[in-house]
Amino acid sequence: MVIANSIKTSIPNYVIKDISLSDFGRKEIKIAETEMPGLMALRDKHHSDKPLNGAKIAGSLHMTIQTAVLIETLVDLGAQVKWASCNIFSTQDHAAAAIAEQGISVYAKKGESLDEYWQYTHYILDWGTDSPNMILDDGGDATGLLILGSKAEKDLSVLKNPSNEEEIALFNSIRSKLQEDSSFYSRIKGNIIGVTEETTTGVARLYQLQKQNALPFPAINVNDSVTKSKFDNLYGCRESLVDSIKRATDVMIAGKVALVMGFGDVGKGSAQSLRGLGAIVKVAEVDPICALQAAMEGFSVVTLNDVVEDIDIFVTATGNYQVITNDNLIKMKDEAIVCNIGHFDNEIDVASLKDYPWENIKPQVDHITLPSGNKIILLAEGRLVNLGCATGHPSFVMSNSFTNQVLAQIELFNKSDEYSKEVYVLPKHLDEMVARLHLDKIGAKLTKLTKDQADYINVSVEGPYKPEQYRY
């Protein structure tokens, strides 16, 4: 591990695994840039006018090669940035090293502890005598930390009863920070112009805060941009899920019986991913519409309890809690593979497995012996499998998501007076612009409406082409 601190402050400039990996990281970043036309187009368009000049962004998002391209785009557009990963296993250490080498503050190591995770999240919010004024979040941890910390300033009892290991680490980190600075969280929170949120789970948190009239600043829901949710969540998972399972286990997918729990965009991509390599795929759902979609796609729609003893590969993709419980886990067949591709690690009751013998096979791959004598293979300790056991989504699809992130940061930072403390979605014309920026790369050519055709369907020749409520 490398900790660098060249200025007089308690916060190091960066904390990474190994700075000598920076050359390797830079080579991969250069390749990724060729696959991320949206971000590169924004660099070209805004290199001179610097629309993020003055923005001080606290970023909490997986520290991957693709994220490195995002970070350097934000910096190229004028922003100052501090970055941490939003998952303890998702960092690519060579990507973090390449960013640190450029003098950008990054705090991320693959396999960091929970205590380190929350320390690093504090680091991106602590700018000494200065303060961040924007948050770029993935899962809502940076935003949630400010909110919970502000509550703890007034009432420490909110930290009284942690329910799991993560909350123990989180609560301890807040207590420690309050001993240093009793008004840290409210001070930083008061300086935040807004947050842009990347993923489904984080967006759900924001809408819950809005419903409670507790959202402390405006938020843009990047996840529900069509060019994010219908591309990153669907097509990204379609490629990265089986990549991670095969890297972790070397198992043959063909002929295996797989259960995908959840058939939203992530579940749809996951089911396609497994079926594409020859798995017999079943789906579990609570939503009748999604269940019907799964059935119409040819998947058997089942309940976990009915099939748990017959499944070879379990994949959770719900964004919910305790989807696979201990009662389910102990019934699994020998060598069943269990993994999660939802954002948080509580979809699978991993805590209950701590009572059984564990054998680590390699990083993020564990053999766990059940009371029955059967062994299951748990991937990434129930955290995001595609980032814990592989490198996440391909660069091209992440260019869609991250182009939306940059546009959202520009929008909130420059038009803050137009936004109240609510959750917003980017307008349709920006969604279409993101898609348009990616067509040339894959050789796609758009047909253009004539004026008469546009008038006939009551749209502009240049778009937007669909109403806001249109479901793609």
Swiss-Prot record:
Binds 1 NAD(+) per subunit. GO terms for cellular component: cytosol. Coiled coil: none annotated. It holds the Pfam family AdoHcyase_NAD. It is found in: Cytoplasm. GO terms for molecular function: adenosylhomocysteinase activity. The keyword Metal-binding does not apply. PANTHER family: ADENOSYLHOMOCYSTEINASE. Belongs to the adenosylhomocysteinase family. This is Adenosylhomocysteinase. It comes from Prochlorococcus marinus subsp. pastoris (strain CCMP1986 / NIES-2087 / MED4).
